[in-house]
Amino acid sequence: MAKAVGIDLGTTNSVIAVLEGGKPVVLENAEGERVTPSVVAFRDGETLVGRMAKRQAVLNPEGTIFEIKRFIGRRFEEVQEEAKRVPYKVVPGPDGGVRVEVKGKLYTPEEISAMILRKLVEDASKKLGEKITKAVITVPAYFNNAQREATANAGRIAGLEVLRIINEPTAAALAYGLDKKGNETVLVFDLGGGTFDVTILEIGEGVFEVKATSGDTHLGGSDMDHAIVNWLAEEFKKEHGVDLKADRQALQRLIEAAEKAKIELSSTLETTISLPFIALDPASKTPLHLEKKLTRAKFEELIQPLLKRLRGPVEQALKDAGLTPAQIDEVILVGGATRVPAVQQVVRELLGKEPNRSVNPDEVVAMGAAIQAGVLMGEVRDVVLLDVTPLSLGVETKGGVMTVLIPRNTTIPTRKCEIFTTAEHNQTAVEIHVLQGERPMAQDNKSLGRFRLEGIPPMPAGVPQIEVCFDIDANGILHVTAKERSTGREASITIQNTTTLSEEEIQRIIEEAKRHAEEDRRRREHAELKNALDSARVQAERVLQERQGAPEARARLEAAIGKAKELVERDAPDPELKAATEELLKAVEEYEKGAQAASGKGPDDVIDADYKPAD
């Protein structure tokens, strides 16, 4: 039986979960993250979703769509305030609804939401090794009928059969109370990125009965971000006379910095917001920089109006349920914004008890939705996995080449590690692109996922040692880790889609690889020649920095380095690349000899260029 999933389609982040052995399990996306940013970007004819979309937002503010949940199921006239806050264009649709305009093309909020759902489902399908077509999707308890229908339509656009739309606090209570014995009265305090819900339930003997619910669909963590944005913009305008909110790129930078500051102030008492080159002075045309300290006390002052708005729904829910705070057994915190200390203090003051932190506020809603999906689907069966890997597995390396770590038909379980390094000086992060297939070039193979290893100490190119390990366990689940040896910093991704291709598709890929063998060999050879020249250039630059040679030899070496750069950028033909590499290595050798003669010392630097003449 195919699996049904539970999806928390959030304002700022989304999560997908499935029931495994009767327990809800959150599924990581292709980037190895359990939480996927609810962000869609349109760039150069390509659509990005999630972390990749969020990462490029500053450079593409008008083409990066976030917080779309605030617009779904709403009329344009209802969203004037929200529309002013975002850098992208929000325009009225022909039906009076909301549209997002990107480069002349109009998108409905349902379409954008469907792209997020599709990303979640496709990544989850790969992890599970089977196509997902059914889902339970959660919405804020305070969503109206139009918003609920629009959310269900987004699911259908994404190719899903939406089994049920359920309320987020109810889903959270399901996850919390699944294994509980006895009766409890629970208040779920759900403050997400864009919405606020309070729901009171009685839980007992597997029955989850909602007694009352209240909320505010215009209140969430992003409102706290915007409070910081407004403060920063006002302070900057006072000092420099420049309105940062009028510049879409500057506004996007402010939004990202504000979110980061809010998160930091949950664990520290003070943070510094630093945004260099945020604007130009109108008179002198010189760059202006923003640097501002923000204390937790000041942050709490800025969000005080928002904190006051939390009280009404709690009091209303208690009143509707006919309960006093003393009759509430547990208060469950849900949503990332509940990590803000001032929010937790409001809960203590209103309910007179310490909130229960036994659930993960980011994941519990999706887990509850997965439980509901499991109930609706009946018994969930185990996933059947093959005992060999049907196609080669590897990573993309410099020049767009696929480097194979585990060849096809390797018996599992198995583990294979390789050492890689950086391509540029002072590179502090690498992106690991995991691939499956038989073609030499990465672009011709199936992409299984990407993840980043960050925090690499700045070092010359070729010095860091990054150990990438592929580990396929007995269940056929692929785990990929990347570790920088000097710091021990590590990143990982788990991919369960290594066997999702049909036998016909596997055979087609193998046959295609044979047909393209000669073309692929030439392309790979070309990539290797470019890599060899670029590696020689990087090492030659290091020699210039570290050794003092004769002026004439230095000039020759600098000229050879310049030529190498030009040829690589121009994507020159193979003979030119090969000749330039030989010329550069010769210039390095002459420079080294001159430097050694001048110092009277023997050789202490060895140039190890990864160059191999073509056959």
Swiss-Prot record:
Gene Ontology molecular function, alphabetical: ATP binding; ATP-dependent protein folding chaperone; unfolded protein binding
Gene3D superfamilies named among the record's database cross-references: 3.30.420.40, Actin, Chain A, domain 4, Substrate Binding Domain Of DNAk, Chain A, domain 1
SUPFAM superfamilies: Actin-like ATPase domain (SSF53067), Heat shock protein 70kD (HSP70), peptide-binding domain (SSF100920)
Induction of expression: By stress conditions e.g. heat shock.
Alphabetical list of Pfam families matching this protein: HSP70 (PF00012)
Region (Disordered): 592-615
Sorted UniProt keywords: ATP-binding, Chaperone, Nucleotide-binding, Phosphoprotein, Stress response
Modification type Phosphothreonine: residues: T195
Subunit relationships: Forms a heterononamer with DnaJ and DafA in the resting state. Three copies of each protein are present in the complex.
Any further remark recorded for this protein: In the resting state, the DnaK-DnaJ-DafA complex cannot bind substrate. As the substrate becomes sufficiently high, DafA is displaced and an active DnaK-substrate-DnaJ complex is formed.
Similarity remark: Belongs to the heat shock protein 70 family.
Function: Cooperates with DnaJ, GrpE and ClpB to reactivate heat-inactivated proteins.
Protein name: Chaperone protein DnaK
